[in-house]
Amino acid sequence: MQEKAYKLLAVQENISHNEAKALIDAGLVSARGAKIALAREMLGENTKFSVMKPAKPTIIYEDENVLAVNKPPFMSSENLEKIYKFGLLNRLDKETSGVVLLYKNEEFREAAILEFKNLRVKKSYIAIVKGIVSEEMKFDEPILTIKTRSGAFSKISPNGKSAFSEVYPLMVSGKKSLVKVRIETGRTHQIRVHLANAGFGVIGDEKYAKSRAKRMFLHSYETEILGLKFKAPLGTSFNEFGFEIPKDL
């Protein structure tokens, strides 16, 4: 027999249906190594769930102008504004972890916005992708973003905005690769779209790579702006596929 995922989870965890739905919607529930995407997904009645505890953000740098935070996956960037009471300088997708910057005064905000507009902000990401990446790749492909009530969707299109990404192979484990991605532009879902279009979709990226995992393995590793460099350490989840990741990438 089958039943809706949230009802099965409610029984397993001895919680209400609404609490079970909230956990699934937050991306914290998996079964058989894959994240449960829909609370109403029909599953076998003997399905065993794993429920992740929501990680907390950590401060990686702070001075009188800026606060740099290592955002965990499954948390919206807007939540950081509520927690720390400062405004956002950049945003990450809910599923993406890593460096998020918050400004403390308008002077720094204006200076930072100018850096972003002039493409002077250096950003690098770490990702685990499908397939074996054996050499550097460069993508100079415009991205068009379509925004709907259900969220944003991006695609490569001649009608899109310029988008440039550089991909560097770091190591391989099985049929998966750990890569570093440097970007100059910051288009919506840029890295995910460029990698998926090249056949190296990010593991856990359900939208563009049709990949299900406990999380999306994309992490904003380092951001450099106005002479300051912020680095967010990788979480232990990146060791999941047999990668022995050094402290400094």
Task: Enumerate the language-model features and the residues they cover.
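Pseudouridine synthases involved in rRNA/tRNA modification
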Residues: M1-L23, R192-L249
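Polynucleotide-recognition surfaces of large bacterial nucleic-acid defense/processing enzymes
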Residues: R182
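RNA pseudouridine synthases
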Residues: M1-F153, P158-F164, M171-V172, F238-P246
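Short, well-structured beta-strand segments within conserved domains
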Residues: T47, H189-V193
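Long C-terminal interaction/binding lobes of large macromolecular proteins
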Residues: V167, V179
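Short beta-strand-loop-beta element adjacent to the nucleotide/active-site pocket used for signaling
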Residues: K175-K176
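Short beta-strand segments
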Residues: M137, A163-S165, H189, L228-F230
